[in-house]
Amino acid sequence: MLRVIVLGAAAGGGVPQWNCGCPVCRAALDDPRLARTQASLAISADNAHWFLINASPDLRQQIVATPQLHPRAGALRHSPIAGVILTNGEVDAVAGLLSMREGSPFSIYAHDKVLAILRANSIFNVLNESIVPRRPIATDQPFEPLLPDGALSGLQITAFEVPGKGAWYLEGRAHPGGDSQSGDTLGLTITDKSTGQSLHVLTACARVTDDLKARLAGAPLLLFDGTVWRDDELITAGLGTKTGQAMGHIAMAGDDGAIAALADLGIGQKLFLHINNSNPALLAHSAERGQLETAGWQIPADGTEVTL
């Protein structure tokens, strides 16, 4: 069976953000049940070996909160985490790697462009490549990630290009991996080889193209970019100066938003993740939450598990 754990569902900074008093963050400060850590997933085909989709800055907290990711009883050093698949080079996708520097073996899988970012930042050298190899992945070429002992994982992963943008901290600077936008933002199709069940993960997506609709149609499970409800919400709320589009994220709502664009595709379960603190849909009793739930979408809490 294919198992998915939502380790965190929030966008960069989490909810509440450390210095924010917006309505969503204030509500989460008053009621910790509303809090969410930064977006990351754990995927397994055997319930024993797990692969992370992105390593959020909150990863240590997420591991502590997730028994499936704890060291084996009686082992001095052990982790069931077999690898990390990176979908982009943003801070909230790679910073958690620094919390995995204690010498347990696992592999990092990423596009060459993201691996170039890691090479260009010497702080990531705390991950000894003889123990934590960095394995390039190519788009539209299925691969089976390996367990630390070289055994096959039982998962098949296909990365594909998604409309998006490069890491914000590289804006206006030379990209270590070159100027091409190829590899900046990846989606993933993950399949359990024994059952054929599959899911799609898109932690960032700037727009839904016809090709993307065709790829996602009929999927049993979709985990999709839910950063903002409205494209201009950070600006209108006084929280920022960029639109969702400028950050590489499609809005949930609107004629060109994700809810409308992905309707009527026969998708089974639809979960939003990477949800920004500015997004009113995080509030359980908001009109926005009601609209997305009516359209068949869910806002997962940290720790939500789905089995296919």
Swiss-Prot record:
Record-linked PANTHER family: COENZYME PQQ SYNTHESIS PROTEIN B (PTHR42663:SF7), HYDROLASE C777.06C-RELATED-RELATED (PTHR42663)
Cell division among keywords: no
Descriptive protein name: Coenzyme PQQ synthesis protein B
Any single Pfam family the record assigns to this protein: Lactamase_B_2
BP terms from Gene Ontology: pyrroloquinoline quinone biosynthetic process
Organism the protein comes from: Rhodopseudomonas palustris (strain ATCC BAA-98 / CGA009)
Primary role: May be involved in the transport of PQQ or its precursor to the periplasm, in association with PQQ biosynthesis, but is not absolutely required for this synthesis.
Annotated pathway: Cofactor biosynthesis; pyrroloquinoline quinone biosynthesis
Keywords, ordered alphabetically: PQQ biosynthesis, Transport
Entry's family note: Belongs to the PqqB family.
